[in-house]
Curated annotation (Swiss-Prot):
SMART domains: AAA
Listed EC numbers: 7.6.2.-
Organism: Shewanella sp. (strain MR-4)
NCBIfam families found in the cross-reference section: LolD_lipo_ex
The protein's name: Lipoprotein-releasing system ATP-binding protein LolD
Subcellular location: Cell inner membrane
Molecular function GO labels: ATP binding; ATP hydrolysis activity; transmembrane transporter activity
Domain of life: Bacteria
Biological process according to GO: lipoprotein localization to outer membrane; protein localization to outer membrane
Species lineage: Bacteria, Pseudomonadati, Pseudomonadota, Gammaproteobacteria, Alteromonadales
Keyword annotations of the record: ATP-binding, Cell inner membrane, Cell membrane, Membrane, Nucleotide-binding, Translocase, Transport
Length: 231
């Protein structure tokens, strides 16, 4: 029996603009298991990115619960939420959001510095991760000196620096060419298998999603289907 890491229970999300209400998510239920690779697919506006943001405490649900390792993420203080984001969750975005004036090594180590990890240890961990993602020779380079695929690899290493339980990735290959996107997806799968970290990946590409352990389809704010993929 698989261990449940994250539970989304009857989550809905709506936005209000005067008398107009826009329903983005409607009573979504799902589970993420420890160490699994889960894809969420759907067209633009289907609600998949909003769901990911709610899972990561970046946006608050209008109704429902989100539990990480049994802890209700929306019944804790904002300080505790920030701690969870830094220690237990990792984030990867379509655009890398690296700090432009810092080297690859410094960018990867930054979340560890924020957590209070000893500087030497944080840099050693960052070096190990950069070597693991194939950038051991590019550690001193700033983002402007790296290719798009290399910058996204730095972002993946940064997401893993604090050994999170779960990494949330929003269109991580959306800004890359096909070859670089393929390499990033293979890297995510490899690291998930090696480190035992769970990944939830939002993507518009069904071919790439089909390589994950499971695939969820979002349509008009509803969870439509769950596809199990043979390993």
């Amino acid at each position: 029996m698989q261990d449940v890491l994250l539970q989304v229970q009857a989550v809905s999300k709506s936005y209000h603009d005067g008398d107009v209400t826009t329903q983005v998510l409607t009573e979504v239920d799902l589970q993420v298991f420890k160490g699994e690779q889960l894809a969420i697919v759907g067209t633009s506006g289907s609600g998949k990115s909003t769901l990911l943001h709610i899972m990561g405490t970046l946006d608050k649900p209008s109704a429902g619960k989100v539990l990480l390792a049994g802890e209700d993420l929306y019944q804790v203080s904002s300080a505790r939420q920030a701690q969870i984001r830094n220690q237990d969750l990792g984030f990867i975005y379509q655009f890398h959001h690296l700090l432009p004036e810092f080297s690859a090594l410094e960018n990867v180590a930054m979340p560890a510095f924020i957590q209070g990890t000893d500087r030497a240890q944080a840099q050693a961990d960052a070096k190990m991760l950069l070597e693991r993602v194939g950038l051991g020779h590019r550690m001193s380079h700033i983002p402007a000196e790296l290719s798009g695929g290399e910058r996204q690899r730095v972002a993946i290493a940064r997401a893993l620096i604090n050994k999170p339980k779960l990494v949330l990735a929003d269109e991580p290959t959306g800004n890359l060419d096909a070859k670089s996107g393929e390499a990033v997806y293979e890297l995510i799968r490899e690291l998930a298998n090696q480190l035992g970290t769970a990944f939830v990946v939002v993507t518009h590409d069904p071919k790439l999603a089909a390589r994950m352990d499971r695939q969820l389809t979002m349509k008009n704010g509803y969870l439509q289907a769950v596809a199990e993929h043979a390993q």
